[in-house]
Amino acid sequence: MSSLQTSFPWGFKKAVISKPTKNKRKIQEDIDTLGDAKSRTKFHPNNSNSTSRKHRTHAIMGTKLPLNTLIETLDHESLQKLVKSLVEQRPDVQEALYNAAPTVTVQVCIDKLTDKVENIKCNLPYKVDTECDYTYLRVKALVHEFFQALSDYMLNFLPPQEYDVSKSIEFLNGFLLKVLLKMPMFSHMEFKYYYKLTLDKLNTVYVNLIADFIQQKPTNILLLKDSDLAEKLLEINKHYEDYFEQVSQLLSQDEGSDIPERLQGLSNLLNFSSENNPLNGGVVSSVKGSW
């Protein structure tokens, strides 16, 4: 019989590698396997239960945009179309829109008319002279739109819509000095008609505004003389070949002088609507206001 050492030279005990260790490992593996099975059973129910729970979950339903968010999202053109469509479908809302709309300022109107002139220029055919009829025909619709807007804005600054004569004069001066001078001078007969009609009407409006203002109170002429109106009219007449000389003559009157009556010769002229254009067969008729 050979004698066995009581311990290994590396310091391990015999009990560590004895046969019972093998059985313990197998038992432990069985326990772990059983534990995993229970865990899967507990946290992963079968398909039927899972489907049942899904049916009980509340669904997230889509909704329309809130009106405030919708309006904020629309661009200028889309919002404009929306309002026009609403007015066409519901004419009864027009008065509510007028009451809720902010006051339109003179500067905003001048800026809008300037934008329309710039739009006309941008749409002119490349390297084609404005003397050519083809050039005007290319932008004819935009020119009509411009004159229609001018008519609308001018009426907005006349009595009985607007009684503040300073705003009326501000619009007239702004249009004559900042807008109309930028308009291309087309040689087409229709444009010449519109252009001449514009000057005729603006001269009539200007004379009547000043005459009415002075007749309300004779000392008002002193207010006009103390303003820069005389200088503005001097500049306007320079650009338009003294077309508004009659307005300047009113300012040169002394306090208490007889003021000529309102001009009536153009009171039956149309506004600048292309539908009423006599060149297109329209019938001349009276227009609202003093325009």
Curated annotation (Swiss-Prot):
Matching entries from Pfam families are given as: Cut8
GO cellular component terms given for this protein: cytoplasm; nuclear membrane
The superkingdom of the source organism is Eukaryota
Recorded GO molecular functions are: proteasome binding
Q: Which InterPro entries match?
A: Cut8/Sts1_fam (IPR013868), Cut8/Sts1_sf (IPR038422)
Keyword Nucleus attributed: yes
Q: Which UniProt keywords apply?
A: Cytoplasm, Nucleus, Protein transport, Transport
What main location does UniProt list?
cytoplasm
Residue ranges of the region described as Disordered: 37-56
Cleaved signal peptide residues: none
**Gene Ontology biological-process annotations:** nuclear protein quality control by the ubiquitin-proteasome system; proteasome localization; protein transport
- Where in the cell does this protein reside? Cytoplasm; Nucleus
Family that this chain belongs to: Belongs to the cut8/STS1 family.
Q: What does this protein do?
A: Involved in ubiquitin-mediated protein degradation. Regulatory factor in the ubiquitin/proteasome pathway that controls the turnover of proteasome substrates. Targets proteasomes to the nucleus and facilitates the degradation of nuclear proteins.
Q: How does it assemble?
A: Binds the proteasome.
Protein name stated in the entry: Tethering factor for nuclear proteasome STS1
Which organism is this protein's natural source?
Komagataella phaffii (strain GS115 / ATCC 20864) (Yeast)
